[in-house]
């Protein structure tokens, strides 16, 4: 089942990438971006950046890159549907209800 783009966009509108990422990565503001230690690699110098304006994160040490859904899927080892449910709840939205068309 596919989620409608409008539903996913509403989640992204309500939640900043830094808001989601900062629950597992300590971030520091640097200009328009945030930086922190990579959640994907064991590192001593921060190479992980978050850009709320462009709605993505990027890890220069591992090459990982994505949006809030990708981040949850990769850091929590969950599927897309589960990430959508978690983020929708965090955004104060109702879970999406798929409608099924039954054909005779």
Where are these regions (language model features)?
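N-terminal structured subdomain of primase-like DNA metabolism proteins
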Residues: 1-100
């Amino acid at each position: 089942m596919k989620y409608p783009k409008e539903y996913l966009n509403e989640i992204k509108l309500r939640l900043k990438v830094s808001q989601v990422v900062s629950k597992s990565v300590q971030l520091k503001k640097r200009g328009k971006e945030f930086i922190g230690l990579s959640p994907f690699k064991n590192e001593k110098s921060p190479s992980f950046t978050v850009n709320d304006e462009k709605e993505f994160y990027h890890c220069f040490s591992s090459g990982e890159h994505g949006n809030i859904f990708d981040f949850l899927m990769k850091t929590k080892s969950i599927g897309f549907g589960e990430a959508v449910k978690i983020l929708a709840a965090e955004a104060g939205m109702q879970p999406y209800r798929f409608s099924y068309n039954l054909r005779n």
